[in-house]
């Protein structure tokens, strides 16, 4: 007999997938001409540990149609035992949508690590809950935990609405919701109250980074 309580996905997350380039041998970016390319996002990085241990995980996102970078991201996710759901959005010309770049200097000695985010035109800022068949994902396939973070939730009014709607749908099917306070204060400038009034009530597991972040959402 099939176990009706069995969930297909251990953890699902809402995210905007991007690309990280890192100089070889801990060199500074401006001194380098060889870089390691990785598909990454704050939320999908949370899935990596679980998926590497065997349980399948799921990313809910958007891709740029026909983009070789989107194809690279999809291949990287498959290699990590992470499934993905999301539409391929037309680029809209050379000045249209793209996947964000994260340019990371790992630092060396007295030179501190440094990250430069290049996110103009980021396709993930347009996420829409309507893109996802929540009855299939949460109800039929099954998900144990839906993971959200303050980063994706704050990227745009659209991503805020998307996260809240998906969390509400997930809870209808008994899915636990986790929310981490990797919230990037600059993203929430002028909207800090939303963290405590909208996201805290829907959260089953709150992951804090520091006392100041915890105080912000619980004040």
Predicted feature residues:
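General beta-strand structural signal in soluble alpha/beta enzymes
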Residues: 13-14, 86, 117, 177-179, ...
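Generic secondary-structure signature for well-ordered alpha-helical cores
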Residues: 19, 23, 78, 82-85, ...
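Conserved N-terminal subdomain of the carbohydrate kinase-like
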Residues: 56-150
